[in-house]
């Protein structure tokens, strides 16, 4: 029977590295008595690591590490290497030795070893790990190959993996509901206008099923599922109404009145009935006045359209940014076409005015020199102006 099986319940033996070296190992090397000796003497090279659990067990509690004293022996009588082989495998050192300090003084070193099944160099690595402690006063000194050491053996702790059953499945259902709810918002504008009526009908059906004398809030408190559903429906109706208002404002902007290009209105009778000397001046002044009035009206319409568009752009929110950028491009193209037409009309009017001024100057010079030739030119000019008036009416 194990002599350490009668310890009181709850007793666990977990000494620190400093306690193992400075108290237990130092007394063992000095052959001093240990008051309560829980550490056995084990010949490590004749016992497999899985047999240590029963030999080094303390009490009836489950243990995760086991402690024992072992005496190091040389592998060869004339060599310096330590024998760490067993019947089933061998212990192989890994990494560098760790120094153990107590009150800033070096008291020992710790070596880490791993157990391999089979024979070197084809051994199979196992989960058994051993910490071997030895007394040492010089960290860079040559380790002693003989003497007592205290060892701690344990199995490598595997990373804890959480089972899938530990997770609650309710958030996944909520996520699916939210996905379906968000997908319904991406439908067409026509379906958006139909969906609110459908939700109103469902709310009316819920009200019909409520008990008599119980208001909607009390019924929702007694039915948490209905309460959550109603909150989602209210939130959805709010989103649909907001999108509907944005669509209407967007359509009202797209249906702005078309800007008409300025037209030159002239009367044939005025062109033919006015005296030759005064008709050109009056026509030019009236033409310039009409152009100025049309330009002023055109600018007012553009300013009004820009104000409406800016107010719509500021109030519509981030959801309509891409569509409004497209509308800006359409408006720019439309304004550019109107301006190009206006510039063309202005250029043609200036060319006609220059031609009329030139012909008037030539007529005055010819009238002074040859009155008969001047009268012939006056008749030709009257015919040309009448034809130009007819052409302008067709523009």
Curated annotation (Swiss-Prot):
Transmembrane segments: none annotated. It holds the Pfam family NAM. Keywords: Activator, Cell wall biogenesis/degradation, Developmental protein, DNA-binding, Nucleus, Transcription, Transcription regulation. Expressed in root, shoot and hypocotyl vascular elements, columella root caps, epidermal and cortex root cells and root-hypocotyl junctions. Observed predominantly in root imature xylem vessels. Present in root developing xylems. Specifically expressed in vessels in the secondary xylem of the root-hypocotyl region, and in vessels but not in interfascicular fibers in stems. Residues 344-362, 382-395 have a biased composition (Polar residues). InterPro entries: NAC-dom, NAC_dom_sf. GO terms for molecular function: DNA-binding transcription factor activity; sequence-specific DNA binding; transcription cis-regulatory region binding. It comes from the Eukaryota. GO terms for cellular component: nucleus. Residues 344-395 are annotated as: Disordered. Transcription activator that binds to the secondary wall NAC binding element (SNBE), 5'-(T/A)NN(C/T)(T/C/G)TNNNNNNNA(A/C)GN(A/C/T)(A/T)-3', in the promoter of target genes. Involved in xylem formation by promoting the expression of secondary wall-associated transcription factors and of genes involved in secondary wall biosynthesis and programmed cell death, genes driven by the secondary wall NAC binding element (SNBE). Triggers thickening of secondary walls. The NAC domain includes a DNA binding domain and a dimerization domain. Interacts with NAC083/VNI2. Belongs to the plant vascular related NAC-domain protein family. This is NAC domain-containing protein 7. It comes from Arabidopsis thaliana.
